């Protein structure tokens, strides 16, 4: 009973979003500024500006038309950013302030596909999908040149690095490179040697040599004085970008003699250095490529000495230029987040499994990202061991892997196991100590994997690769896919949930069947043991959550509230409450004792596949198909403290208001009553003020001293008062003061003024008509009073006259 009472006192009532990990790069161009401190990348309708040091998005720039950004470029002086949208508008930004300094039509008849600044940051060239190339003077704000002749989409433009030569290069879908003279306004030459799309152009320091790369798996060296190809270098991969390296020896990259060397990035996913004179590859990046690691973009920031690459998985990688040593990793887009877990003994990191073979580890404090390679197919599930240093992952490649994070936050794969014949969809780690893990697969079996003793040593570093795991127990558990497995807090029981609509309880380590939980109408997505009681929670595609007794396998409670499948469930508040997530994008907080849904959290836009709670039970983590990972903070205590402070303040102010009313200090009481949001008290105060002979002047003087928000509140009160004929006079008095003393522009700026006026008009007309009829009736009565003449009464006859009239 004492434990129950303590648990009730710790009931949670609300969570608030503390942080979001959202997409910031969805492919296309990415660019560093000259200092290497800021990274610019496209994400739909926005250009995001990242701080390289922290990985945080400093600012998002979005054009007024809210159309997708098709191209952008940053000037060499780092001052001006120009963006182009599908609405055929160009926007010039002062990006450091986040403001648009100029907006103009691109004049292209189709969206702008590429753009580039000249070395002086004065001219901007744009290439469109209409085959046209235009040149703009950014300083004087006019178009200078319009070049036609390119068939199809112009996807590449570049100025010659020598501004005195006034040359512009472009390439379209015909794989030719056109050289345009800005001085003669003509095409000087057409360079034809590529057989597929040209992807990049680079120029030597003296400006006499140009390097071009293409998807035809060759790079070509051009002599710009003769406009002839001097050498063709086969690189044996589709090249997306080629960069000329500085002409200085770099032994780490195989650059030992003077000459022209260039760096290529392509579909093999590795950076390679080539000697132009011999056509030989002198350096190949040691990092082995993996699925989705094809390089789609590469640039060199000479001043910062950094190479930036982008992968097909929308990851941005920064390398030190002289050694190609990896410096930074940024996960631009996680696609569909399938599972999330806190990582580290203090939950300092987050590991995310998305629709990719790679895992992403984020440090919550600094936003630093680490991308983990190892699986060869999509990772489906994660789980963390008790101490937080080790975690497990399973994937569609039919394998399970164990990863270790060191104290520096670096993660490496230390063990792997295989044996399932289909995708491994769920994994659970032992709870008491780091001794084993259990996996469930689409082959309808579960496997128990004991951890080797060598794996438990923190100093163990597998020099020869990950340790191989051997399954100790394999058991066929269900007739359909196993979606979830859970290990009891004492490591002696195993629960499995399947698409066959049942959950089963097994004894570990032999996997002996103890009982079956039946009652759901559709397949089960999640099973979870209570940390305090002998209870199992199951979440199903039928939209319900059920609690089951482990002793007799009976259903104790059913929670209904989700409109779609319930994908995850977790116990919080020492087993007295539940957190659940569903395919409707909602996260719900339930109190078990009364089956009540305490709070519904709506921050995701799609299926919430991942749900995990922190060790201290003060944070929750969710991941969804909308590519968002959200960190939730328990704000129950903060809200309760805030509510208590607010109530105490209300009591003090209410007492002050009562004192003012008792002392008949109505003018001060009016503002206080408005602040307390007491319409009836405000009405009483105004009625008291209007009983004074000088009511109009006092009411007007008091209202003029009110703040704008108080006047807005008073106007809202008037709407309610005006609906009652007994209080309409006070409402009209207040409205009259506002209309007489406030300028129309100020009144229209009030919050909700239009709705208030619409509500006031019909009742005001009705009151006016009623008062007009009353006034007419009063005038008619006054008229009758003044014009009414009463007849003079006749005098009564005397007794003698009466007697005389009776004689004959």
Swiss-Prot record:
Subcellular locations according to the entry: Nucleus, Nucleolus
Chain positions with N-acetylalanine modification: 2
Keywords for this protein: Acetylation, Isopeptide bond, Nucleus, Phosphoprotein, Repeat, Ubl conjugation, WD repeat
Cellular component annotations (GO), alphabetically ordered: 90S preribosome; nucleolus; nucleoplasm; small-subunit processome
SUPFAM superfamilies: Putative isomerase YbhE, WD40 repeat-like, YVTN repeat-like/Quinoprotein amine dehydrogenase
WD repeat extents: 64-105, 107-146, 149-190, 193-232, 245-284, 290-329, 332-372, 374-413, 419-459, 477-516, 519-560, 562-602, 604-642
Signal peptide positions on this chain: none
Biological process (GO), any one: endonucleolytic cleavage in 5'-ETS of tricistronic rRNA transcript (SSU-rRNA, 5.8S rRNA, LSU-rRNA)
Domain of life: Eukaryota
Assembly information from the UniProt record: Part of the small subunit (SSU) processome, composed of more than 70 proteins and the RNA chaperone small nucleolar RNA (snoRNA) U3.
Function according to Swiss-Prot or TrEMBL: Part of the small subunit (SSU) processome, first precursor of the small eukaryotic ribosomal subunit. During the assembly of the SSU processome in the nucleolus, many ribosome biogenesis factors, an RNA chaperone and ribosomal proteins associate with the nascent pre-rRNA and work in concert to generate RNA folding, modifications, rearrangements and cleavage as well as targeted degradation of pre-ribosomal RNA by the RNA exosome.
Protein name, per record: Transducin beta-like protein 3
Originating organism: Homo sapiens
């Amino acid at each position: 009973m004492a434990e129950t009472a303590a648990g009730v006192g710790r009931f949670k009532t609300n969570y608030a979003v503390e942080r979001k990990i959202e997409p910031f790069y969805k492919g296309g161009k990415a660019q560093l500024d000259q200092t290497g401190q800021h990274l610019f990348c496209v994400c739909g309708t926005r250009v995001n500006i990242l701080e390289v040091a922290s990985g945080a998005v400093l600012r998002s720039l979005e054009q007024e038309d809210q159309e997708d950004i098709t191209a952008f470029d940053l000037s060499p002086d780092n001052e001006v950013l120009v963006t182009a949208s599908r609405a055929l508008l160009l926007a010039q930004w002062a990006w450091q302030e986040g403001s648009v300094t100029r907006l103009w039509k691109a004049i292209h008849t189709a969206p702008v596909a590429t753009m580039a600044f000249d070395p002086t940051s004065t001219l901007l060239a744009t290439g469109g999908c209409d085959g046209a190339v235009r040149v703009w003077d950014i300083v004087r704000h006019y178009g200078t040149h319009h070049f036609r002749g390119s068939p199809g989409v112009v996807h590449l433009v570049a100025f010659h690095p020598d501004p005195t030569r006034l040359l512009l290069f472009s390439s379209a879908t015909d794989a030719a490179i056109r050289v345009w003279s800005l001085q003669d306004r003509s095409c000087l030459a057409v360079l034809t040697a590529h057989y597929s799309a040209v992807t990049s152009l680079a120029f030597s320091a003296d400006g006499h040599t140009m390097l071009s790369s293409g998807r035809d798996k060759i790079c070509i060296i051009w002599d710009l004085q003769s406009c002839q190809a001097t050498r063709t270098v086969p690189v044996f991969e589709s090249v997306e970008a080629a960069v000329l390296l500085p002409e200085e020896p770099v032994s780490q990259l195989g650059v030992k003699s003077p000459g022209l060397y260039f760096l290529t990035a392509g579909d093999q996913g590795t950076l390679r250095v080539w000697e132009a004179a011999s056509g030989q590859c002198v350096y190949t990046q040691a990092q082995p490529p993996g699925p989705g690691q094809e390089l789609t973009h590469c640039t060199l920031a000479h001043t910062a000495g950094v190479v930036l690459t982008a992968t097909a998985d929308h990851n941005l990688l920064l390398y030190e230029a002289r050694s190609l040593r990896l410096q930074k990793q940024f996960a631009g887009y996680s696609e569909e987040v399938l599972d999330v877990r806190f990582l580290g003994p203090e939950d300092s990191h987050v590991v995310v499994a998305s629709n990719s073979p790679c895992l992403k580890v984020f440090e919550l404090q600094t936003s630093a990202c680490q991308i983990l390679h190892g699986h060869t197919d999509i990772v489906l599930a994660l789980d963390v061991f008790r101490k937080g240093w080790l975690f497990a992952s399973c994937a569609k490649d039919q394998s399970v892997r164990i990863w270790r994070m060191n104290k520096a936050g670096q993660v490496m794969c230390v063990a792997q196991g295989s044996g399932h014949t289909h995708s491994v969809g769920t994994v659970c780690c032992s709870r008491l100590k780091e001794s084993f893990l259990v996996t469930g697969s689409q082959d309808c079996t579960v496997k128990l994997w004991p951890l080797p003793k060598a794996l438990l040593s923190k100093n163990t570093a597998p020099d020869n690769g990950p340790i191989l795991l051997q399954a100790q127990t394999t058991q066929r558990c269900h007739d359909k896919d196993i979606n979830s497995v859970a290990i009891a807090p004492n490591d002696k029981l195993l629960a499995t949930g399947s698409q066959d609509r049942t959950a089963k309880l097994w004894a570990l380590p032999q996997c002996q069947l103890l009982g079956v939980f039946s009652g759901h109408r559709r397949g089960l997505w999640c099973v979870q043991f209570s940390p305090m009681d002998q209870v199992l929670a199951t979440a199903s595609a039928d939209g319900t959550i059920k609690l089951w007794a482990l002793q007799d396998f009976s259903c104790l409670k059913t929670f209904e509230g989700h409109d779609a499948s319930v994908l995850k469930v977790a116990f919080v508040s020492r087993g007295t409450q539940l957190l659940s997530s569903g395919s409707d994008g909602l996260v719900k907080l339930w109190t078990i004792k009364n089956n009540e849904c305490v709070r519904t959290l709506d921050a995701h836009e799609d299926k919430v596949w991942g749900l995990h709670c922190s060790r201290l039970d003060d944070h929750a983590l969710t991941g969804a198909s909308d590519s968002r990972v959200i960190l939730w903070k328990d704000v129950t205590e903060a809200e309760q403290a805030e509510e208590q402070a607010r109530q105490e303040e209300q009591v003090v102010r209410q007492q002050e208001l009562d004192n003012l009313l008792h002392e008949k200090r109505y003018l001060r009481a009016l503002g206080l009553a408005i602040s307390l949001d007491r319409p009836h008290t405000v009405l009483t105060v105004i009625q008291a003020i209007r009983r004074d002979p000088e009511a109009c002047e006092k009411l007007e003087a008091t209202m003029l001293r009110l703040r704008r928000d108080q006047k807005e509140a008073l106007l809202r009160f008037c709407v309610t008062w005006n609906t009652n004929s007994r209080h309409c006079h006070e409402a009209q008095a207040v409205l009259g003061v506002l209309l007489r003393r406030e300028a129309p522009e100020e009144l229209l700026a009030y919050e909700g003024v239009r709705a208030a006026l619409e509500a006031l008009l019909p009742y005001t007309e009705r009151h006016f008509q009623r008062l007009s009829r009353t006034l007419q009736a009063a005038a008619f009565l006054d008229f009758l009073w003044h014009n009414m003449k009463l007849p003079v009464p006749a005098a009564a006859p005397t007794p003698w006259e009466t007697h005389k009239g009776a004689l004959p």
